[in-house]
Amino acid sequence: MKQLLLQAFNLIRQNPFYATISIIGTAVTIAFVMVVVMIYDFRTMDMAPESDRSDMMYTGSGMTYRKLDHTNQNSGMGRKAFEALFSELPGVKEVTWYRGVSKTPCNLSASNEIFNYYVRPVADNWFKFFDYEFIAGRSFTQEEYDARRWVSVITERMALQLFGTTDVVGKEYQSNFFPTKVVGVVKDVNAIFQTAYADAFVPFSLENEDYYATWTGGLGGIRLGLLKLLPDTRPAEVRTEVQHRQDRLNSSTAEYAFEMNELYTHTEYTFFRGKDISAPLVYSMLLMVLLIVPAINISGMTNARMQERVT
């Protein structure tokens, strides 16, 4: 060990430039690898409220178009298409749906101060699908959901900022100028949970879903789906079954057809969603970065040996 340290010290003294590059490069590479691993773990490992990330699949928006000439294309999935493709899928434990978050003005009726919060419309089984920690109250009931009542589950941060306390079950606030009753309060959700995150959750039934389906033969809409797979189910099997169902659906429709070509695992949805991001390209770039430092080290060592022979 002592001899190795002496050799390293002599190498640094004889070739300070290459030694400095080698040390800095090695340190940067180690730090880079640690950051990549940490980001990957935080974004993909099973953590509450997204406790089943490894078993989840995400749908895209899908697309409707006129069969005759592929015109009148619109993105978005409606109730009819969603139920035809994803209801009672073999190998799927549970299915839910939602709409993306939107920044919504919220305030108390007795106050002129308006706050903007991220509000997410969700299905009636949303709080069974994810593991939120309730501080007070409950999720909205099936009756409230079906009756399209203006109720919401809000986060601790929103409750404290809006009301000054978390004891707010039964109280009302204005959500986009609609009186909304608080039925539950959950622990804050970090934005790293891209699907479970929101400041407030309201029933998806409040959305005028049928309006979006009127000009697409009932197929179009605003739903995004989530599937929770059984342990032995492979994503490829689900994709194959969904494709078969899609073919059957389109063979039974008159004017419009629906396409769902976007079914992601959690890792795919998090890092490689969309056609602009190529997984092979990302992996190749990471590999190149990891190989640069060893290449510099070898180059420095070779140059040092050559200088020794010359002298």
Task: Show which residues each predicted segment covers.
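Membrane-helix entry/capping segments
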Residues: 1-3, 10, 14, 247-287, ...
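Intracellular coupling helices
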Residues: 5-17, 21, 296-311
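Residue-level signature of the transmembrane alpha-helical core
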Residues: 8, 23-27, 288-291
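Short, strongly hydrophobic transmembrane alpha-helices
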Residues: 14-44
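Membrane-proximal extracellular/periplasmic loop immediately following the first transmembrane helix
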Residues: 36-109, 113, 220-224
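The feature marks short, hydrophobic/small-residue-biased sequence motifs that occur predominantly
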Residues: 99, 108-146
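Mid-to-C-terminal secondary-structure elements
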Residues: 123-139, 150-274
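Internal alpha-helical transmembrane segments of multipass membrane proteins
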Residues: 281-301
